[in-house]
């Protein structure tokens, strides 16, 4: 085995080398970049990925004339890098200006006994020589120096010249013609932003990695943060517009440091003084963390080994979401027709909601309800105005809001209705899903949800869903409340008979029983009305909201009722440390405004009609579908369990770039973000039609 093979086969530990130098830059702004990134937690970010990381050393720029001082700095850096590689570490060099690359990559080559391939990610070519440079700043010269041309202070560092055939430059958009001619004459491959925009970064990165890692040989990565667009990374020495996005670059370099052939990583040109909000530092750390991240299969294995086995996810590891689209760790895009069980009704990373989250997070996040905050009253005011209820009690998850409603109902039963203490009954329906706490599980009819978790609280009853007569028969003088979903989502998108909720409302009113609607999934426009109960023109005594209320960013939920119900709560009766916090209140209030401003309720009704019409067309063309059910953008495809199963079909849709989820193995849930366009919805429906057509062709033919 060669020395190179031995080196690259070692299990790496990352060793940080900070370089406090701006000797090659026009200003000293980047001198403190390495130390600033250290304070921002760059070591911890790497440890989060499961790799070992430690700070090796910090190198200070020596005093003296500029070029001799730079030469001394480069020699010291090259020696440190060489020692790190030789001992099996992966050096992560943090600058400082890009001139330090002339030391980093000579050091790697010296350790290898041969030149590494080099992936150079930069807005600029940095391929000037002293004769061609307009500014004569050394940070514009390191790539030429590494190819053996330039000032002796930068070229006469121990280690081999780079092989131009194994150098690839990505992200370039600002350079002088002399630089491009210099690199072209030597055969260095340059991938500019125009090509990246035309072909996509993933395709360009694949070509670049094939160049730098040709013949299975070792390589490294030099990242000048100015490769990023200034909107993401303003804190750089020489910003240049129309650059790379952080998320797309993170995906493109994902896991590269775990590649046994990647021997070193370098990040340069970070200027803390120009990064008041810390955007650039976070971008740099995010990119390095992405390069250290395990691959999708490894991440699934880690979760399986370290997490509880209470979920069986579809085999995809998602890493980014924008609007109605999600991307996995490999950059594959998927249309989201699940929207996290309606939690992402406003789409992923809605710009207004993200801006509100970021702004509020820098002001005030959590104080507990021991004090007032300036955001909660405004949220409560808007929420009650919009829904028409007098009061709202904010908590976090849907489960908490359901528990809050049950507590309110029981105390109302005891203190207002006059039910004997500890005798207040709650009625729910078979097939319900209200959460998974002990009390709520006691209301469930699903055997798996109940198995092994008893005993459950007393005075909990269940009746058939959709049967108003069964409700009337179940009510006793001790009944405090009837808890019902307007549409049973987890139960299979089950819609009750027309007039059912109205009949239940009349029965409850006649017997002085609270009607509480669980609208955690159906509320806030999902079904084409603000509340799903409005389809039956009823106003429940209490409504439970959640999921979409947090804008897809935070867990926010609430129980809404009028004073006659909410009066039962006195200080100390109920609470939640995070419930009603300023951050959640700000985001939820903005989510309500987005709902109104973008007319998402009306949009859900219109697109929902299209969705259901197309699903019925698909069903008519296949024996695999037994029924189509839904309202608004909330639909279910029930399949014939004798012919197929919903999980298999969901996996087939995943393979075609569509994310859905089965429920109980027989129903495929369709609930896209309310922001989905007609074109996006049609694209997803076409994939659904194709999957059912393919599955139908595989059915055995009758004899």
Language-model segments: which ranges?
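Catalytic cores of soluble, metal-dependent hydrolases
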Residues: 4-92, 103-104, 110-113, 189-296, ...
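Conserved N-terminal phosphate-binding loop of PLP-dependent enzymes in the Aspartate aminotransferase
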Residues: 297-703
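Active-site histidine-anchored catalytic micro-motif
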Residues: 90-156, 259-260
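Active-site-proximal loop/helix segment associated with metal-binding centers of metalloenzymes
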Residues: 157, 173-194
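Short glycine-enriched, charge-decorated loop/helix-capping segments at active-site entrances
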Residues: 66, 133-134, 234-242, 343, ...
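A short helix->loop->beta-strand "cap" motif at the edges of active sites that frequently abuts
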Residues: 165, 262, 510-513
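Active-site glycine-rich loop that binds ribose-phosphate moieties when present
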Residues: 136-177, 199-203, 444-448
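Active-site flanking residues adjacent to catalytic metal/cofactor-binding acidic residues
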Residues: 17, 96, 121-123, 170, ...
């Amino acid at each position: 085995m060669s020395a190179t093979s031995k080196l690259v086969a070692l299990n790496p530990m990352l060793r940080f080398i900070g370089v406090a130098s701006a000797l090659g830059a026009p200003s000293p702004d980047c001198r403190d970049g390495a130390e600033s990134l250290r304070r921002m937690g760059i070591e911890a970010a790497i440890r989060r990925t499961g790799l070992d990381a430690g700070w090796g050393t910090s190198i200070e720029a020596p005093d003296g004339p500029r070029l001799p001082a730079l030469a001394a700095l480069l020699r010291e850096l090259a020696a440190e890098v060489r020692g790190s590689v030789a001992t099996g570490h992966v050096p992560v060099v943090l600058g400082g200006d890009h001139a330090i690359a002339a030391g980093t990559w000579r050091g790697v080559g010296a350790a290898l006994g041969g030149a590494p391939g080099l992936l150079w990610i930069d807005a600029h070519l940095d391929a000037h020589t002293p004769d061609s440079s307009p500014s004569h700043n050394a940070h514009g010269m390191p790539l030429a120096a590494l190819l053996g041309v330039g000032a002796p202070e930068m070229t006469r560092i121990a280690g081999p010249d780079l092989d131009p055939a194994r150098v690839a430059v990505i992200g370039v958009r600002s350079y002088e013609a002399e630089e491009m001619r210099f690199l072209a004459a030597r055969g260095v491959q340059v991938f500019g932003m125009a090509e990246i925009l035309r072909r996509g970064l993933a395709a360009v990165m694949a070509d670049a990695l094939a160049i730098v890692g040709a013949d299975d040989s070792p390589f490294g990565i030099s990242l000048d943060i100015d490769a990023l667009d200034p909107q993401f990374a303003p804190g750089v020495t020489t910003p240049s517009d129309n650059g790379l996005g952080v998320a797309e670059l993170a995906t493109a370099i994902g896991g590269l440091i775990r590649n046994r052939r990647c021997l070193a990583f370098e990040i340069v040109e970070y200027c803390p003084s120009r990064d008041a909000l810390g955007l650039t530092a976070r971008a740099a750390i995010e990119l390095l963390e992405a390069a250290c991240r395990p691959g999708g299969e490894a991440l699934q294995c880690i979760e399986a080994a370290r997490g509880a086995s209470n979920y069986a996810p579809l085999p995809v590891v998602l890493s980014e979401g924008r609007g109605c689209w999600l991307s996995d760790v490999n950059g594959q895009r998927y249309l989201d027709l699940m929207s996290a069980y309606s939690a992402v009704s406003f789409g992923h990373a809605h710009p207004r909601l993200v801006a509100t989250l970021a702004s509020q997070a820098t002001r005030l996040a959590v104080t507990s309800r021991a004090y007032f905050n300036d955001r909660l009253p405004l949220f409560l005011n808007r929420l009650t105005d919009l829904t028409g209820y007098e009061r709202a009690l904010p908590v976090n998850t849907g489960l908490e809001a359901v528990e809050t409603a049950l507590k309110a109902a029981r105390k109302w039963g005891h203190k207002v209705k006059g039910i004997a203490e500890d005798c207040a009954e709650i009625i729910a329906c078979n097939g319900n899903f209200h959460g998974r706490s002990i009390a709520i599980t006691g209301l469930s009819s699903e055997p798996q949800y109940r198995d092994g978790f008893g005993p459950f609280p007393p005075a909990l009853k269940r009746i058939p869903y959709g049967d108003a007569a069964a409700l009337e028969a179940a009510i006793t003088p001790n009944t405090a409340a009837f808890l019902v979903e307007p549409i049973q989502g987890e139960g299979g998108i089950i819609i009750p008979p027309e007039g059912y909720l109205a009949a239940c409302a009349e029965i409850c009113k006649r017997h002085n029983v609270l009607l509480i609607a669980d609208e955690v999934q159906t509320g806030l426009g999902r079904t084409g009305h603000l509340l799903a109960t409005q389809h039956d023109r009823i106003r429940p005594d209490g409504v439970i909201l959640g999921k979409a209320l947090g804008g897809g960013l935070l867990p926010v939920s609430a129980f809404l009722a009028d004073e006659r119900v909410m009066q039962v709560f006195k200080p100390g009766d109920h609470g939640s440390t995070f419930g009603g916090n300023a951050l959640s209140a700000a985001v939820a209030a903005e989510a309500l405004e987005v709902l109104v401003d973008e007319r998402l309720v009306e949009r859900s009704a219109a697109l929902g009609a299209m969705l259901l019409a197309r699903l019925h067309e698909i069903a008519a063309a296949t024996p695999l579908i037994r029924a189509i059910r839904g309202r608004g953008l909330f639909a279910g495809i029930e399949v014939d369990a004798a012919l197929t199963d919903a999980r298999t079909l969901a996996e087939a849709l995943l393979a075609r770039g569509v994310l859905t989820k089965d429920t109980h193995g027989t129903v495929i849930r369709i609930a896209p973000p309310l922001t989905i366009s007609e074109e996006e919805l049609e694209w997803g429906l076409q994939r659904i039609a194709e999957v059912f057509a393919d599955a139908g062709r595989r059915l055995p033919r009758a004899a």
